[in-house]
Amino acid sequence: LNNLIKSYKNNYEYTDQVRTLVNSILKNPEFIGGTVSFDTKVIKASKGKIFCKSGAEGVFLFVDFQKEISGVIKITDGNERAIPIAILNIFKKFKVMSKVELKNLEKKEKFELKNHAGRNIGRVSLTMK
């Protein structure tokens, strides 16, 4: 991710292509994951300041090119339902997004777990060390 930041900010052989790709996604967040994916919601909530992408088996990466902050998380059991709560807490802790942006993003996420009958059976939460 540090190399992605360098490629975006400096003049390397592929800098123009990297900027074109990243800027296209930041201006059109649906390109990265459709209309309801968490990555699309993050890009929209940050007003195009944070590039991010979720991957298979509970992987999520993010880059803020202006602040030069980047990170990757991996949910050990591969279940993606923990990604939003983990990312929201990381963004809060490291002030990646403003309080208003975080609140707007958090409103769009559901952390309650329901069974097939629609009954509430728990909640996804995070304990950070």
Model-derived regions, located:
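Structured C-terminal helix/loop/strand segments within mature extracytoplasmic catalytic/sensor domains
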Residues: 2, 6-129
